[in-house]
């Protein structure tokens, strides 16, 4: 887990940074974003590495730092015994949190389950100059019979973070690293903010036809409105000189987006001698439509600073912008894979094919044109 900032739920994976865009939630990619990831509705998180991850359903990503692996997330489901917990937390410099966790099973055979998790978070973090205001509610509803399992996960979240940027980029002329500063230093400027609200859902259907054949269907969607994003250097971080000095530049932005995904497939279970085979054939499609800011000007110099005394702001951060379509991307893929097990040995053999179309939008005189690639 990468430390230093609460803005993104970043992980380092094989030396490369990844975030929510590479998370699979209940086998559905793309419903989380690169912004701060909600953890309270998550039951487990598993890192899947290696070339075999390419045979899973393919989502539409908008981050280029794909590390050759995925983070597989399973959401909380209703346990066999009823749970009803209310928790209050205090941390940082007065960051107050409230969490509700309710789960229960219903029906003659406890075939229905409901799990609801909520968050209310407000206050200042342990990092100076960083404040959080966040609310969210997620629900997981599952239904299980002898041969069929359905699971619906749906939720809404609002999150506003003021300050918090602690990313630095070395200037091209730097030949040695600056001296290490105090970890408590504040590098926020007035008007630094990242704010988003939106909802997501996933649906999974698993069907057992007989002892040799299974079928599955996965669906997911997301509506996320990152409607305020005022960060240093357009969000990429401060550029450091060799002596630790920096220039504070900023411009406002936003990236509202919508995302859809579906996958259908079947799995066969057979043995050849002592080798067990689980052979899966699947097909999926995914769409991501994304807007970006315009009429937001270029980067504005609003002050100076350094690693040791913080930020010295001389101008107010810019705030004016509008949004319009930036790109629309669609991808479809086919996968065939054989998971083979022999005693303590495991092997994976698979083939995968995908096709993608991306339409970028150029604007001139208030009209748009598509560029397909």
Which ranges hold each PLM region?
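Repeated loop/turn-to-beta-strand initiation elements of outer-membrane beta-barrel proteins
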Residues: 79-83, 110-114, 147-152, 212-215, ...
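Acidic, small-polar-rich N-terminal luminal/periplasmic segments of exported/outer-membrane proteins
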Residues: 1-80
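Acidic/polar loop-and-plug regions of large Gram-negative outer-membrane beta-barrel proteins
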Residues: 125, 138-208, 223-257, 301-321
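Short sequence motifs at beta-strands and strand-loop junctions characteristic
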Residues: 5, 91-94, 129-133, 191-197, ...
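Outer-membrane beta-barrel translocator/receptor signature
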Residues: 40-43, 52-137, 145-150, 199
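Face-selective signature of the C-terminal outer-membrane beta-barrel domain
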Residues: 201-224, 246-363, 371-373
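Outer-membrane beta-barrel proteins
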Residues: 75-77, 104-108, 122, 141-147, ...
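Hydrophobic, lipid-facing positions within transmembrane beta-strands of outer-membrane proteins
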Residues: 9, 69, 82, 96-100, ...
């Amino acid at each position: 887990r990468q430390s230093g900032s609460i803005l993104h739920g970043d992980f380092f994976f094989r030396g490369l940074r990844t975030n929510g865009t590479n998370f699979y939630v209940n086998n559905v990619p793309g419903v989380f974003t690169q912004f701060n990831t909600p953890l309270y509705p998550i039951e487990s998180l598993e890192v899947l590495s290696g070339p075999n991850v390419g045979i899973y359903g393919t989502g539409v990503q908008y981050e280029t730092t794909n590390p050759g692996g995925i983070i597989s997330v399973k959401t909380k489901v209703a346990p066999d015994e009823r749970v009803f917990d209310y928790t209050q937390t205090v941390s940082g410099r007065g960051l107050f949190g409230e969490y509700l966790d309710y789960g229960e099973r219903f029906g003659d055979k406890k075939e229905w389950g409901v799990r609801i998790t909520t968050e209310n978070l407000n206050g200042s973090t342990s990092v100076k100059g960083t404040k959080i205001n966040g609310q969210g509610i997620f629900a997981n509803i599952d239904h299980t019979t002898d041969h069929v399992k359905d699971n619906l996960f749906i939720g809404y979240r609002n999150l506003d973070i003021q300050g918090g940027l602690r990313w630095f980029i070395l200037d091209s002329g730097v030949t040695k690293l600056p001296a290490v500063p105090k970890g408590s230093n504040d590098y926020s400027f007035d008007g630094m903010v990242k704010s988003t609200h939106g909802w997501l859902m996933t649906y999974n259907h698993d069907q057992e036809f007989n002892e040799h054949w299974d079928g599955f269907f996965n669906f997911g969607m997301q509506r996320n409105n990152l409607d305020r994003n005022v960060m240093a250097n357009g969000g990429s971080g401060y550029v450091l000189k060799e002596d630790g000095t920096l220039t504070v530049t900023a411009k406002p932005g936003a990236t509202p987006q919508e995302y859809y995904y579906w996958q259908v497939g079947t799995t066969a279970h057979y043995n050849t001698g002592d080798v067990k085979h689980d052979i899966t054939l699947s097909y999926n499609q995914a769409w991501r439509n994304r807007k970006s800011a315009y009429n937001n000007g270029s980067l504005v110099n609003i002050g100076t600073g350094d690693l040791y005394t913080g930020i010295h702001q001389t101008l107010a951060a810019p705030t004016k912008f509008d949004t319009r379509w930036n790109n629309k991307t669609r991808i479809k893929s086919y996968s065939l894979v054989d998971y083979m097990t022999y005693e303590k040995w495991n092997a994976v053999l698979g083939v995968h094919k995908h096709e993608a179309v991306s339409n970028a939008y150029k604007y001139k005189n208030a009209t748009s044109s598509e560029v397909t690639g």
